[in-house]
Amino acid sequence: RVPAFGTAITPGTQVTKTIDFGTTGCPLPNGNVVKGQIIITFVFNPGATSHTINYQFVDFYHNAIKYEGNKTFTRTMTTATATSPSHPIVTMNMDMTATFPNGNSYHRVGQRVREIIAGFDTPALLADNVYQVTGSWTTTFPNTTIQTSTITTPLQVKMSCMAVNKPLIVSGVIS
């Protein structure tokens, strides 16, 4: 629920917002169907250089696939230097399970760090943005096989190389 107009939230306040798609399925304009809840929590602190937002998936389904677990995003601003303006680094930690209608479950735990390394000083122009991505994750498959993936050479994503509304990875190694 949105607080009544005029109700101020003070810095340091824990905020919890629940997106409730109901229990019967909510069709989206693109044809996907969702149900369940996503609970978003964060501490309101507008002056901080770091912000963390947690997403908890509760009985959440997307096109009959059940998603359970948490994703946490932490956005931190770097300190400006003589050669680099202050820019954001976003760290995503996840511990999620996807269960398909046939009962197969996939569990993934991991971390991804995305840093904008070029283009941050031109906020109105997204095409010049370049991101560097690092991280690692472990996936457990239904047959209990475990696969660990690690970005051994940072991935570079250039927004100028967008194809079909998706930016492309132009370099880097995942092993």
Residue ranges, per PLM feature:
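Low-complexity, intrinsically disordered segments exposed to solvent
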Residues: 1-175
